[in-house]
């Protein structure tokens, strides 16, 4: 890239120097001499207004694309409302099909114990999906307090010009700094941070379970409905009523939607589960990856200062303190607060052990 740029800039600079030299000569036409002089004046004015010795080509590109960034951020902000409505409509359509189409069919074929199991599991799963999605949307992710000087800060935010605690990052869409920011989720129309990260992951997890349950449970009904739809164009045409045709198409829609969401959302859930097991957020993964490469080039090993071990990472993330909390705080709806305030973090055991060994020496 640099070689191509130098090949293009070399002839351009040579032509410009020739024009400047011609401008000094008296034989040069007055028109050309005036153009060269205006070029110099314009260059001086531009540099006096915009020149910065600390800036470079990257700064100029960022400044040029700032209107584009602003447009994208505002479009995503408004599209977040559309995505939230879309999630509610799609989820509501699946629930309506389950009650209006699936339930009348299984009432005639399933046994009473099997019906009871499906009844309790499906409603338990639905309650957890609705609860965690509502909490993820309405719960603020957490913002660093402004005007306080007693918080431990790592740096100053270049956008907010406020102290930025550890694991805090600026969201260009919300235009605020977010504590332990993971990402901005358009499907929530909200940032995923310290106080709603658990709700986001729990929604993804239980929504994946619900989609897998619907896809697997409706497999036989889907096959029958799909085979019936294939016979619509036969001669003579089958004698299906309007209600039966709607039921067939609804079952096919249910199976394809739940299967596709189970695959896509399941992959996202597994990815976030891996990050949680490592004690990282989505942003910290990229930061730690660069830091790991930098230290590896120096022959050193990078260790995540927020990794407490796989099990302890999950306990901190889910807010679990006792064995009973796995039932009351994970498998049942719970609005308990996460561990910590999102601004200061306890050091992991390996950091404490290293500090103790240094003090002993």
UniProtKB/Swiss-Prot annotation:
Spans through the membrane: 78-98, 117-137, 199-219, 251-271
Function, in words: Palmitoyl acyltransferase that mediates palmitoylation of proteins such as PLN and ZDHHC6. Required during embryonic heart development and cardiac function, possibly by mediating palmitoylation of PLN, thereby affecting PLN phosphorylation and homooligomerization. Also required for eye development. Palmitoylates ZDHHC6, affecting the quaternary assembly of ZDHHC6, its localization, stability and function. May play a role in DNA damage response. May be involved in apoptosis regulation. Involved in the proliferation of neural stem cells by regulating the FGF/ERK pathway.
Keyword flag Kinase: no
Cytoplasmic side: 1-77, 138-198, 272-361
EC numbers for this chain: 2.3.1.225
Record's signal peptide: none
Subunit structure of this chain's protein: Interacts with ABL1. Interacts with COPS5.
Recorded GO CC terms: endoplasmic reticulum membrane
Lineage: superkingdom: Eukaryota
Iron-sulfur is among the record's keywords: no
Natural source organism: Mus musculus (Mouse)
Reactions this protein catalyses: L-cysteinyl-[protein] + hexadecanoyl-CoA = S-hexadecanoyl-L-cysteinyl-[protein] + CoA
GO biological process, one term: DNA damage response
Span of domain DHHC: 155-205
Effect of deleting the gene: Lethality one day after birth. Pups and embryos show eye malformation and heart defects. Mice display cardiomyopathy and cardiac defects including bradycardia. Heart defects are characterized by thinner and enlarged ventricular walls, cardiomyocyte disarray and abnormal nucleus morphology.
Pfam families: DHHC
Topology of the protein relative to the lipid bilayer: Multi-pass membrane protein
Catalytic residues of the enzyme: 185
Cellular localisation: Endoplasmic reticulum membrane
Topological region Lumenal: 99-116, 220-250
Keywords: Acyltransferase, Apoptosis, DNA damage, Endoplasmic reticulum, Membrane, Transferase, Transmembrane, Transmembrane helix
Tissue occurrence: Ubiquitously expressed.
GO molecular function, one term: protein-cysteine S-palmitoyltransferase activity
Record-linked PANTHER family: PALMITOYLTRANSFERASE ZDHHC16
The protein's name in its UniProt record: Palmitoyltransferase ZDHHC16
InterPro entries cross-referenced by the UniProt entry: Palmitoyltrfase_DHHC, PFA4/ZDH16/20/ERF2-like
